[in-house]
Every structure is written in structure tokens, then in C-alpha cells.
Regions:
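A short alpha-helical cap/connector motif
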Residues: 1-195, 205-263
């Protein structure tokens, strides 16, 4: 019953999002228009996609049981502390569409440093690291056995730029911030944000608490531009942006009557 309630809530939230969402043709920010054009609207297949999805397919068939230590706000799928790898791959890894978006976002912004809180099996990490092989990438995972698997995956995918820190965010985040110095828990990271930083927040509509947290982050005075893509949210700190703006964005193919033909 709880799972059905969650699904129904997400469907309702998506309908609300869909009603509000603008395509790129309704955006007033030139920067955001270009970003959407080269990330949300881009349909090209890059070399890394098939390799990473090949790994995902292997994980979806992996019956190995591992012990899960969940230090986060709670797993999306409740159950025993022993989980099969295929269950983790199905329920905690980013979708192929989100992975491709993250790759394009990193490819567009060209960061020199990246920090990820929550590695899981490393699918999200792999998409981002593959788009910026010269960037320094630190990812933190609280579950030791999951972290060990993710490290194996980074080695298989030849991603030497990824440094995985195994431990809780409380333990490892200060260490990561000291190592990164200038960064490409919101308040802790905020002091390291600069004009070119992008914060990517996952699952912003998953629960009322996460929606409230997302709204609070959008309202923060240091955030100059925010974008709701439903599955994730983007926060920017562009000093050249004089007025604070927020946009709810959807691919133009999903709202064909908002493609600019009748403007």
C-alpha cells in the first residue's frame, strides 16, 4: 500500500510539473537556453553511453548478495539489510536518461572538480566522470560493500580520475571539501561554491520533505538561477545574473505546441 501511495503521489507531482513546465522557447535566460539546448534537447549518443549501459545490464543480472549500510534519509525500497546487486541496480542507479543528461551537463559546463554525495554502484559517477576525464572527481559512499563494488566498476571503465571515499557524509565531506578547495550537505558545500559552480540535486519531488528542502535551496540568496527538471534540480551561482530566476523545464518534444511556432 505504501508503494502505491508513493507512485500515485509522484504521478500527481509529475502532472503538476508538466502543467507548469516551459520548453526552451519560453526561457528568458540566454545561458539557460543554451544549457537546455545542449543537455535536455540533445539526442546524440556519445561513445561512453553504450559502455556504461553494458555494465548496468551485467549488474541487473547479478544475484550476489551484499550487506547494505544506509546512512541516508532512507532507501527508496524498504526491506532487509541484505540486498542483491540486481536490486540495487534496478532501484538506486540513475536511469539511462538521467545518466545521459548528467554526461551532457558535465560536458557543457566543463568543470575542473566534481563532488558527488552517494555513489551507490557508480553508474551516475561513471556518466559524469566519462564526460570530464581530466577533472578531479571525488564521490562519497556510506556503505562499505557498495563502495567496494563501485571501485571495481571504475577500474573496469578506466576512470582513474574518480576518487571514492568510503564513509558517512559527516565523516568524509569535510575531507572532500579540503581536497577540492574550490568546488564545482548544501550549507557545507555552499561556502566553496563560485560563479561557475552547479549543484545537482536528485529526487527533488520524492517526498514533501525533499520538496521543502529544494524550495529552501532555491530561495537561498547565493542562488541566482534554479531549474526544476522533475527528476533533478539545478542550482547556479552566476554573479553576472542580476535578477534571481527559477524555471521549470521540459523537453520540447513533450510539449510540441510550445515549440515556438506560434510565438
Amino acid at each position: 500500500m505504501k508503494r502505491i501511495t508513493i507512485i500515485l503521489r509522484l504521478v500527481w507531482k509529475y502532472l503538476q510539473y508538466y502543467w507548469r513546465a516551459e520548453t526552451r522557447y519560453g526561457l528568458h535566460s540566454p545561458f539557460l537556453y543554451e544549457l537546455v539546448e545542449k543537455t535536455v534537447e540533445d539526442t546524440r549518443n556519445f561513445y561512453a553511453f553504450s559502455i556504461i549501459e553494458g555494465l548496468r545490464n551485467l549488474l541487473l543480472r547479478d544475484d550476489t548478495q551484499i550487506t547494505i549500510a544506509d546512512h541516508g534519509a532512507g532507501s527508496k525500497v524498504t526491506g532487509s539489510s541484505r540486498r542483491a546487486v540486481h536490486s540495487l541496480a534496478r532501484h538506486t542507479a540513475v536511469s539511462p536518461a538521467t545518466g545521459r543528461f548528467l554526461f551532457r551537463l558535465v560536458h557543457f559546463t566543463k568543470p575542473t572538480t566534481l563532488l558527488e554525495l552517494g555513489t551507490s554502484l557508480g553508474i551516475s559517477t561513471a556518466y559524469q566522470a566519462a564526460a570530464a576525464r581530466k577533472a578531479r572527481f571525488i564521490t562519497i559512499e556510506g556503505c562499505p560493500e557498495t563502495a567496494a563494488l563501485a571501485q571495481q566498476h571504475f577500474e573496469q571503465l578506466n576512470l582513474p580520475n574518480v576518487q571514492l571515499l568510503a564513509g558517512t557524509f559527516q565523516e568524509k565531506l569535510p575531507e572532500a571539501l579540503r581536497k577540492l578547495k574550490r568546488l564545482d550537505y548544501f550549507e557545507q558545500c555552499l561556502q566553496f561554491a563560485h560563479s561557475g559552480s552547479v549543484f545537482v540535486i536528485a529526487d527533488i519531488h520524492w517526498s514533501a520533505e525533499m520538496e521543502n528542502a529544494w524550495r529552501e535551496m532555491c530561495r537561498h540568496p547565493k542562488v541566482s538561477l534554479s531549474a526544476d527538471l522533475f527528476h533533478i534540480g539545478l542550482l547556479f551561482f552566476r554573479k553576472e545574473q542580476r535578477e534571481k530566476e527559477h524555471f521549470t523545464i521540459i523537453r520540447s518534444v513533450l510539449k510540441p505546441w510550445r515549440m515556438g511556432f506560434f510565438d
